[in-house]
Amino acid sequence: IEDEVGEHPYGVDLIVPAKYEGSDEGGLTVHKIADMIPDAHHEYVNEILEKYDVPELAETKSGQFSMKNDGAAPMSAGTAGPQLEIALAHNPSLVVNALGPPPQFMIDQVKEAGRKVGALAGKAQHAERHVNAGVDLIIAQGYEAGGHTGEIGSMVLIPEIVDAVEDVPVLGAGGIGRGRQMAAAMTLGAQGVWCGSVWLTTEEAETHPVVKEKMLQATSSDTIRSRSRTGKPARQLKSAWTDEWENPETPMPLGMPLQPVLINDAIARINR
């Protein structure tokens, strides 16, 4: 990143949910999570892959994280700690947490390093909890946003959060891809905007070219909030994968982080 942006400021976002399987213990290992997954869900994932003739992975390949070690499960405090250390070894100006208030260790380490810390919020109550935890700014992320998002639209959410947190800076997020939307967010009281999905189609993004093209061709009706990727509602492009998990006669997606562990290799096969 620093090779690309030079001395310009940049930020890093991590995901440590407020609630997830094993959160009371700081997160479970991949092996323990894998042991909790019902056989019916494994069978269903295999049925989907067979239905669409998705090729097997090579023996030397694996998904986003290794299933052969006993490391911390994804999207947990156990994985965020090392990620934070790597981030702070560089020069991000801002570290942001999603799906809950940043853990205290994150706030302490970021502030000790002289950086700012923020958090995404889908409700005014979430924003208030973030401020009480000690964050420096709030990202008010509306229903329209890509990725993990709540159920309140940006037009309503942004002013609610601005009013709730008073003097804490608020960035508006969710459905912001043009200057008009940026102007609207700032008219609602936000001091700036936070964009995510719009960057996935840039030349610098690592997004697969096929996915980039699908995103560029998509309309506002071509997305869905689905738990099929992470176990929590996340907006993504509609696909055969999301269609299969929306079928009421099939198993419901598991919670986080069981669902990511369940589909780890499957997503790698699909992306290939």
Question: What does each model-identified segment do?
Answer:
Residues 18, 143-144, 175-176, 198-199:
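Acidic, glycine-rich active-site loops and adjacent beta-strand->loop/helix elements
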Residues 27-45, 151, 156-171, 177-272:
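Conserved active-site-proximal phosphate/metal-binding subdomains
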Residues 99, 173-174:
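Glycine-rich Rossmann-fold phosphate-binding loop(s) that bind the pyrophosphate
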Residues 1-165:
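Active-site entrance/lid segments in N-terminal catalytic domains of soluble metabolic enzymes
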